[in-house]
Structure formats: structure tokens, C-alpha cells
Amino acid sequence: MHKKIVIGKKDIVDFPQINLLELPVKIDSGAYTSSIHCYKATEVKVNGVKKLKCYFLSPKNKNYKNCIVVFDDYRTKNVKSSNGISENRYSVKTKVKMFGKLYNIELTLAKRWHMKFQVLLGRKFLSKKFVIDTSQSNLSHDNIIQYYTY
């Protein structure tokens, strides 16, 4: 018998490694990759090594002060957006905290300032871990763990 955690259509999660806490996220089974709002990403050299300097906005701070993170491990990938346009985006690996557990996640960096949710969790992350119940919300944030068994 197998079981997966039930997740709602939206939630609130933490990205502790990059100090972004209590971010509202949309669970998006239509998106393959997960993405996060990043208003600026710049490649920099530190001691001769290329790194990616990212400028995130943290909605937890009422003044929306900059959250700057430098990634050693990053890449670019081609992503097709919901409007069908392909673009190259930076991609980073970090951890997301949901249901009291840390999960590895790959996030593409996108300009989502005009979107309701700064973070989308896509199928690549969700598969084999979660089942979506669109009638529910904030199950992880409220620490309500339900299982779907099959």
C-alpha cells in the first residue's frame, strides 16, 4: 500500500536556506517546474568562481526589504510559460519546509511581481509526494496532515 500527503490548492511555506519565510504558494499541477519571484539575478565572480546573486522580495516584511541570496550551484534552463512563450531562466536548488518536513526543490527564477502568488509549486516537485485536493487550502501551514492511500 502506498500513501501520499494531501495538499490543497494553495498554502504557506518556508524556504529556510534562503531566509524566505511564510510565503504564500500556489499549487499548480499545470506547471511542470516550480518557480519563485526574483526581481534581479546577476552572475558575479567571487575569488574567480561564478556565482548567482539573487534579489528576492519577502512578503513577510511589511516594508518589502530586499532579500539577497548568493547561490554557488545554479544553471539556466528553457521554460515554457503558461502563455506558450519559451524563455531561458536561472534555476536554483534549495529546500522548502512543508508539513514540518524539509524537501529538496528546484526553483526557476521568474518575474512574478504582477502575480497573486510569488511562488508556484509544479508537478516535478509535487509528484510522488502529494495529491492535490482543490477544495482545501493551507493544510501544511495549519499542520493538518491527511493521507491518500492507494
Name each region found by the language model.
Residues 1-150:
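Pepsin/retropepsin-fold aspartyl endopeptidases
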